[in-house]
Amino acid sequence: MYVAVKGGEKAIEAAHRLQEQLRRGDDSLPAIGVEQIEQQLGLAVDRVMTEGGIYDRELAALAIKQAGGDLVEAIFLLRAYRTTLPRLAVSEPLATENMRLERRISAVYKDLPGGQVLGPTYDYTHRLLDFALLAEGETPAAPQADEPLPESCAHVFELLGKQQLALAEQDDGSAPDDITRTPPVYPCSRSARLQQLVRGDEGFLLALGYATQRGYGRNHPFAGEIRTGYVSLEMVPEELGFALDIGEILLTECEMVNGFVDPQDRPPHFTRGYGLVFGRAERKAMAMALVDRALQSPEYGEGVAGPAQDEEFVLAHADNVEAAGFVSHLKLPHYVDFQAELELLKRLRQEFSERQEARDE
């Protein structure tokens, strides 16, 4: 057994060296730098930060480089590193209405206070390969706005609330759950639910959000507002007693205006779904908002008509790190388990043959 263990250890070390060589690629080409990944693969960095749970573009870019472009592996690396970090303080709630806007659109109001800002987007491209990029030419300078963007813009739901068309969601002052310290138990609070959706796999949530549009869940959404920009981060040191601005982070926020409900105890009103992610991960924010609203079905007395409305099904399977780990463990040796099933199968086949022979006699 000792020889087998040592042999396996050497094989694993060799496999790691091969993987490192594969990650590096052709040595005659310049190695891609972490700064290049951070600057030129920004959307990949945003996803890794969001699902990895750390706002650090350099670390996310490093994880992408180390993982050879495998974003799920990069998320795993960042999530593992996160567990080594101390918690120094808790910030104040983010005031996204004061976001320094880069992009802001609404599909429900053409004209809204603060205006619509397209910002950077792939929405109106023709999805044709740009072969000019092969020439690695200079990127044309981006146009500059004639006027500065407003420093603060009210949310669309705030406008709907003033017309009593939507309920205002007020902070009740209770401390939100923390899924990194207390494992969620289903059914869970909305704060725990939103935390799991933020860390959830984009593709999984996107598929569930799409399913709600195809009839697997009562959901008729409008993109009430999608905004991307920089939000100030504040904290209150105990020795000072007042808030200090310690920096800003880039966020994308999505609020979906969903089909109205007609409860017995209050006037009919629109419902909402909410998504908030690091960076410019707009598709993830939209998918998160769709699934958030679907998971509110029990609160509105709606039956479960699709998987997106099943809280435990969605939240227990959305984490790609956990899912990848469980699926990957199937690659580990299962010799004893397989031998047990093999022996059982042989015995059943023997019994079957004996019954066949007895029947023939």
Report the location of each language-model feature.
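Acidic, serine/proline-rich low-complexity intrinsically disordered regions
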Residues: 140-361
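Intrinsic-disorder/low-complexity, polar/charged segments
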Residues: 7-11, 33, 70, 201, ...
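Aromatic-enriched hydrophobic runs in primary sequence
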Residues: 2, 27, 60, 67, ...
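Helix-turn-helix/homeodomain-like alpha-helical modules used for DNA recognition
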Residues: 87, 92-149
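Hydrophobic alpha-helical segments, chiefly the membrane-spanning helices
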Residues: 34-58, 63-89, 93
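N-terminal, Lys/Arg-enriched amphipathic/low-complexity engagement segments
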Residues: 1-49, 99-119, 123
